[in-house]
Amino acid sequence: MAVRDGVVAWLGSDDVGRAQFPDATVTDLDGAFVAPAFVDSHVHTTATGLALTGLDLRGATSLRHCLTLLREFAADHPDGVIWGHGWDETAWPERSAPSTADIDATIGPRLAYLSRVDVHSAVASTPLRHTAGIADGAPLIADAHHRVRRIAREQLTAGQRAQARTAALDAAAASGIVAVHECAGPQIGGLDDWHELRAHTHGVEVIGYWGEHVGTAAEAHDLIARTQARGLAGDLFVDGALGSRTAWLHDPYADAGPECAAPHGNSYLDVDAITAHLCACTEAGVTGGFHVIGDAAVTAVTAALQATVDRFGGPAVARCGHRLEHLEMVTEEQAAKLGSWGVIASMQPNFDALWGGPAGMYAERLGADRAAGLNRFALLASQGVPLAFGSDSPVTDMNPWATVRAATTHHTPGSAISARAAFAAATKGAWRAGGVRDGITGTLVPGAPASYAVWDADAFDVSAPTDAVQRWSTDPRSRVPVLPSLTDDLPRCRQTVHRGAVIHG
């Protein structure tokens, strides 16, 4: 492969390349695997960096272990707010989340914010709750959670926030990722964080989405002008998350006890509000979208999209590239409609890897039957819904090969897709979801941006998921590109290049 001015200039055999470009600087990759670089279609950059530089609770194996990690971190960091992330009580023997009393008993009168792994609920120390004006005992979900998180974030210095962003983007580059879709909004990090991130200099490209509701085309134009966002989409919340029991469901949570105040989860936007936003964005020619997980939330968004199509027509809606984040509970009928309207599904296969299956968190929250219908990648792809894959980091790690593997090994038979389709969703599909629709970005062909990663991989194959029909030839003479075997030993990133510039390695 020859690269000139950040663009792929030529591909072919080694001897022809050396003859055609005799004065080129030659890098011998010594058998390494080169592929288009990844794009993560859903991240929270500052929060990811804070998880990397702060207290990481994702490895906690019990409530006691979680509190031990908190105690040790507090001792090592005696000043400032404690920012922690990643606890998941569903994997603990106690099956009990940490409480404010637990936090106070562990660290005393310090400010501490500890978000659950899905970042849709949290626990905080009493001093932080009081600073945020949250009553004792009130659950930290929805607006209360956003208020506590905002107060905790305000305790961080500009230097700490910048350090966190650099750590997050460095981690992306080290994972073979050259671009991320930042899903920001007034409830996520606020405008200050948004503007600081946009001003942050790094080799990883940040494509920003701003999740704030608008009601008219004029409001959409104004908000795009003020934020310079790629679209008014991303984490504009229709509902919450299944782990926190805040995703909006038609039927109650299977494990909702009598103390559960909202057994059907939470609805943050109704059909009329969703329709108003989509109509405003469509009229303005702007990408709109939402965070949508529960089946009731998907029903509401589908109804709103139907109303938007009825008003503006299918082609006008399709031109905008509206996108839905997560889209975990979708029916066959809904998938067909979304495909016909060109709606993009920005999904996270590692959600199924972590929480799917008959003994997983999804089954605990929903029961086995409903849980088996989550994250239906094959259904959506079969109905023409464009897929874009990401991590929702810090909810899951930015590990794109693990993402590809998860999409091919879905817990539910019939929901997996091939490795090649999953790879496309994590590269070309994610570029397309970000508004880049030239047909070549995310590939390595002459004229495409030279954005690629170099990997050490132990073995290669061309394979379909075990429950899918083979859709391309495995004969080497067909010259179909192979992919690394996605066993326990995933490929290791040696170098990442974006538009011809080395950003890692």
Model feature map: region roles:
Residues 6, 31, 42, 66, ...:
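Divalent metal-coordination and catalytic microenvironments
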Residues 126, 190-193, 298-306, 355-362, ...:
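Histidine/acidic-residue-rich catalytic or RNA/ligand-binding cores of hydrolases
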Residues 200-235, 321-328, 332, 359-385:
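Phosphate/diphosphate-binding loops
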Residues 227-230, 306-308, 338-346, 383-386, ...:
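Glycine-enriched alpha-helix->loop->beta-strand junction motifs that scaffold or abut catalytic
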Residues 267-308, 433-456:
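Long hydrophobic segments that form regular secondary structure
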Residues 405, 412-413, 418-428, 432, ...:
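C-terminal cap of metal-dependent C-N hydrolases
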